[in-house]
Amino acid sequence: KKTAGLNERVVTEEGYQEVKKYLKLLLPELTKDNRKVIFFVPPMTKYLYAAYSSKLKSDFEEQIVLFLEKFENVEFLDLGCDSHFTDDDFGDFEHLNHNGGIKLTSILSEKLINSQRKENDA
């Protein structure tokens, strides 16, 4: 609850505007030459995920995720409550352990490879 509470205080309208300002500056450069950019919410324990308010989740969706959809070659992946992860994948209440890190890397790699295959098939 403490981490979720801290994030709720940090994530304000001004904070969202600041994030969007920097994304507008960075994304054109990052996606140059048809490069893919993936933003993701990392996996969370069920306890941490439950501690985040529904308002925080919906505000993030409205402010950031919808904003990212405006850009070519930018994807968003929400792994916050992804079923691939269990409590055994965490070293504490919010950080992945070694096995969890391997699992996350595998999921992200697969996403990039599949995205590239789709592009090559088009």
Language-model-derived ranges and their functions:
Residues K24-V37, F67-F76:
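A structural motif corresponding to the C-terminal end of an alpha-helix
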Residues R9-Y16, Y49-S54, F90-H95:
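Second-shell loop/turn segments in exported
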Residues V19-L23, F39, L104-L112:
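Structured catalytic/translocation cores of nucleotide/phosphate-coupled proteins
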Residues K1-D33:
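Secreted/periplasmic serine-hydrolase-like ester/acetyl group-modifying domain
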Residues K55, D59-A122:
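C-terminal regions of proteins
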Residues L27-S53:
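Active-site segments of SGNH/GDSL-like serine hydrolases
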Residues K2-L6, F40-M44, L68:
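Generic detector of short, locally flexible boundary/turn motifs and exposed helical patches
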